[in-house]
Amino acid sequence: MIIYYSANQSKSGLKILLKNEPCLILENQFVKPGKGQPFNRIKIKKLISGKIFTKIFKSNEKLIYADVLDVKVKSLYKDKKYWNFIKKENFEQFKISKKNLGEKYKWIIEQLECIVTFWDENPINITLPRFVDIKVCNANFDIKGDTIKSGNKYIILTTGAIIKAPIFIRSEEIVRVDTNLGEYVSRIK
């Protein structure tokens, strides 16, 4: 069953189909010019690619509701190309490829609780917690050409990510990382 909304009815947080791709409405601004028809200027985020753009719709134009589902999951383990997850509600297991996870692949650890967005029963997006605690596997290496010594150094995490951290961080310690910025936040004791 297809559900339609007029551009006037759309609110931020509503998920719609645009050019056969699920999108999230971030902002909806109604504009009534002095001359001409009123319209809606809608800020939209594509759920698959993550691109954000603004599109103008006539006020009476119909938008198609996107049947997407956000599911709480827990990461289990990774193999060469995939991360394996389990749905918390029914314990069904599924995989997401490293390619589909993109940069978020670097911040996933075992037993991490996150939210996966499904469309047509396929995972299209993953929302990680803002902060993740990850073990440092190597804190004793330098990047060639980095001759300026400051209060920071590069460290390698068990996930394979390389980040800057203070010089007092040692191997085998656990650090808190901001998954949105990809930066060191603090040391966990």
From Swiss-Prot:
It is found in: Cytoplasm. CDD domains: S1_EF-P_repeat_1, S1_EF-P_repeat_2. Pathway: Protein biosynthesis; polypeptide chain elongation. GO terms for biological process: peptide biosynthetic process. GO terms for cellular component: cytoplasm. Involved in peptide bond synthesis. Alleviates ribosome stalling that occurs when 3 or more consecutive Pro residues or the sequence PPG is present in a protein, possibly by augmenting the peptidyl transferase activity of the ribosome. Modification of Lys-35 is required for alleviation. This is Elongation factor P. It comes from Wigglesworthia glossinidia brevipalpis.
